[in-house]
């Protein structure tokens, strides 16, 4: 009897020692009264603290920045697995959450660290890992992140200081997904090829207009994604998260891009993203992605918690829809591999259709003033809320289409192109002898940079 008593007592002591004090895991953001975001070292240290506190979190790095800083990534899996093969064997889907590709917009970093703490350390939402494993990149662009200052986003309402838009080479990483000039992007592409996440959430803060919504979103649902995956994003994902966010008094709205920038009454445009952008690149790989754009004029606390809730609700749906999403993507991948795209016209550019619908934009009243500096017009928002009934041009139609060739031939002197093919995991073979092949060739008449 005494032996049993001692054993029970020891178990009780062990249990007490493992009890988590929530205050010990407050983030820098929370400790600052929701006004500040941590620097690189503080962010990495906190991520390692979470790893030490939870057996289901693994800390790793995906590569280095141009200046040699590690790009951190957390792997969160209910079994503590850190290898993609083992996670895939269990049938889990993989969700990638990334922040600070534009380090002046750090909302997703602070939201992500709080959410992963609540899931894996405080055990508030263990159900979010039932059928989903999470990858979290808190700082995609470490060098840009450490170009820290209070004036990097002069029209943004917090945090007190933030990083810079580009990396140390002055490259905008969210325009680099195809050309992959930056070492950060080359590392990211290798990670993406290894994990191939079914869903990516890319966290940003927007520029521009004033309105009620704490966040807006972009999703590739206008023609450049396979139709079944498009239907899932529109009818399953967006319908679910928009309803949930509305109930939380955090309404969502499509990314606001006025047809004429200085005239909100001109209506709203939709668009398809090029593959140089994250959501466009995910679409080109037959994967779903969401662009999160919190509203720059909202205070930092509001923006971070709106991001937190959207990330959480996204994970709820991913667990509900894991098999469905996995099956849709598997079928699309299979059709792509079989060459189904070669049988039909392939759109290479889109334009906005003239058709529109009337939507209610929860906006703000404004006046048009003459600028003393430029003499041009500028919009001055009054801060008073107003519902605007305006047209939303929500249809995109192909501007140019083409028949995809059976293959492309890349001359060996274009070694940079060949390296890029490797980075994008594009399969190709090398000719081992001279041969004559009848081909069609393209000539680029006009090139421009963005």
Residue ranges and their predicted role:
Residues 4-13:
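Sec-dependent N-terminal signal peptides
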Residues 16-450:
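Structured catalytic-domain cores with a bias toward divalent-metal coordination
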């Amino acid at each position: 009897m005494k032996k049993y008593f001692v054993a029970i007592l020891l178990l009780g002591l062990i249990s007490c020692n493992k009890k988590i004090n929530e205050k010990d895991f407050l983030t820098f953001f929370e400790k600052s009264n929701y006004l500040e975001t941590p620097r690189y070292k503080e962010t990495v240290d906190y991520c390692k603290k979470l790893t030490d506190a939870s057996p289901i979190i693994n800390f790793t790095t995906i590569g280095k920045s141009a200046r040699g800083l590690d790009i951190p990534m957390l792997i969160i899996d209910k079994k503590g697995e850190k290898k993609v093969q083992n996670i895939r064997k269990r049938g889990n889907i993989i969700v990638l959450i990334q922040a600070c590709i534009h380090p002046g917009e750090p909302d997703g970093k602070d939201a992500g660290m709080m959410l992963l703490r609540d899931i894996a350390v405080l055990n508030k939402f263990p159900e979010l890992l039932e059928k989903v494993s999470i990858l979290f990149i808190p700082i995609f662009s470490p060098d840009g992140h450490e170009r820290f200052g209070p004036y990097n986003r002069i029209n943004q309402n917090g945090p007190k200081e933030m990083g810079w838009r580009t990396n140390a080479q002055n490259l905008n990483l969210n325009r680099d997904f195809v050309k992959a000039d930056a070492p950060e992007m080359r590392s990211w592409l290798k990670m993406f090829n290894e994990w191939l996440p079914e869903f990516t959430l890319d966290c940003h803060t927007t520029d521009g207009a004033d309105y009620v919504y704490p966040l807006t979103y972009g999703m590739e649902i206008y023609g450049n994604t396979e139709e079944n995956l498009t239907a899932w994003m529109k009818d399953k994902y967006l319908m679910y998260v928009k309803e949930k966010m509305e109930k939380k008094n955090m309404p969502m709205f499509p990314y606001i891009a006025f047809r004429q920038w200085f005239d909100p009454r001109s209506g709203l445009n939709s668009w398809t993203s090029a593959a140089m952008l994250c959501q466009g690149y995910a679409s080109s790989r037959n994967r779903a992605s969401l662009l999160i754009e919190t509203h720059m004029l909202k205070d930092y606390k509001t923006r971070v918690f709106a991001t937190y809730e959207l990330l959480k609700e996204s994970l709820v749906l991913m667990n509900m829809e894991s098999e469905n999403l996995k099956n849709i993507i598997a079928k699309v991948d299979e059709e792509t591999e079989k060459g189904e795209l070669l049988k039909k016209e392939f759109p290479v550019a889109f334009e906005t259709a003239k058709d529109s619908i009337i939507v209610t934009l929860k906006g703000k009243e404004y006046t048009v003033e003459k600028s003393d500096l430029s003499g041009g017009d500028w919009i001055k928002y009054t801060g008073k809320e107003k519902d605007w009934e305006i047209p939303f041009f929500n249809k995109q139609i192909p501007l140019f289409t083409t028949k995809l060739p059976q293959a492309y031939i890349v001359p060996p002197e274009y070694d940079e192109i060949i390296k890029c093919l490797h980075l994008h995991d594009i399969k190709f073979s090398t000719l081992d002898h001279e041969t004559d092949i009848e081909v069609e060739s393209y000539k680029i008449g006009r090139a421009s940079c963005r």
